[in-house]
């Protein structure tokens, strides 16, 4: 991001933490464990993300996924001042009750 007097960059670690906290705010959802659980692209004022989730067994998967998409998009837009083009969610695991 270009600002008056220089540029601002958001590290991958910071983006990961923003997404992790947004996902954690949705009841019944968590990021899947492992290295390839999420990817976030931030370019020229636009962002997109792909997340691999674990969802609590018995929850309505489309509802939980939609809530995650909304929270992640809101967090990235608010904290990084970007337009979020897409948040892709893949439910990879179900957690036992």
Where are these regions (language model features)?
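A short amphipathic beta-strand at an alpha->beta junction
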Residues: 78-95
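Short, non-transmembrane amphipathic alpha-helical segments
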Residues: 61-80
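N-proximal, solvent-exposed amphipathic alpha-helical segments enriched in charged/polar residues
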Residues: 2-38
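Short edge beta-strands and adjacent turn/loop segments
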Residues: 26-54, 91-94
